[in-house]
Amino acid sequence: MKNLVFLKPFSIKNPTLDEQNDFIMNEVFVEMECASLGEMYDNDKLYGKELETFIPKEVIDKHPDWVIAVGKCATVALGIRRQRKVLLNPKVSYEHLNNVTEFDRENTYGFFDDLHEQDYERFQSVFPHAMWFPQDDNLSLFTIKEVVEEIINGRTVA
């Protein structure tokens, strides 16, 4: 099984040393714990790239079974059609909700933390596989790793 995993890129303007260290440590932890999910695209691979063109090109070139994406990468991946996706905290615009195929409706899963409630509401209006975590304001791929494994391995997820 070939999957592509796009982690959250570093996007803090004028970060403090603590913010930089926190990001790096979290990314290393997620990479180590979630390596079995697929080929990882961490900040080193994403840095300086135009995500809006880079991510779709990687998907076209590599033909993955699943795309797993976090944050801004999830927002970009949401716009890719005819591709199985697991998305964590994408920013959902009304443009993303237009012309959605039945394949995309059935094969796109979205997970949202408390800070992305409005995105969750928009997403679940079109996509039936949506989950909101109201008690969590910093949902990570590691937090939902077991659920993601169930999805990409074809097991039923309630």
For each feature predicted by the language model, list its residue ranges.
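Gly/Ala-rich beta-loop-alpha elbow adjacent to hydrolase catalytic centers
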Residues: 67-78
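Alpha/beta-hydrolase active-site loop
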Residues: 41-61
